Amino acid sequence: LLLLYFLSINININASADDSIKNEDIVSIFKRSMNHWKINYDTLDENKSGAACIPWNTIDKTFIKEGIFIALGYGFNLYDINIAKKAALEGCERMRRANKIENTCKCEMVLYNDDILVKN
């Protein structure tokens, strides 16, 4: 019985590790969310940036496969990374307030050009 208990704990620990959210998952959700608004991030001009209001507490396997972020911000043709971050985060914050989701997520940087900036 004790062996069975430890085995079940080990299985649960491994399942949790496999269920962790990868930065690439966040990027995929971000790009899917942009496509929802008919914007293809990959074809935007260089010096582009993207931010999203990421609901970390509610992201599950289904959300990773099908979900979209409600609030997004992006910019392109921007002078440098600091201006790119500012543009993306400000746009995301505007959508976050407009959709009244201030308590469910926080706007965070996702991409600058093709560099992943997610802090998971």
Short names for language-model regions:
Residues 1-17:
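Classical Sec-dependent N-terminal signal peptides that target proteins to the secretory pathway
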Residues 14-120:
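Secreted/extracellular ectodomain signature
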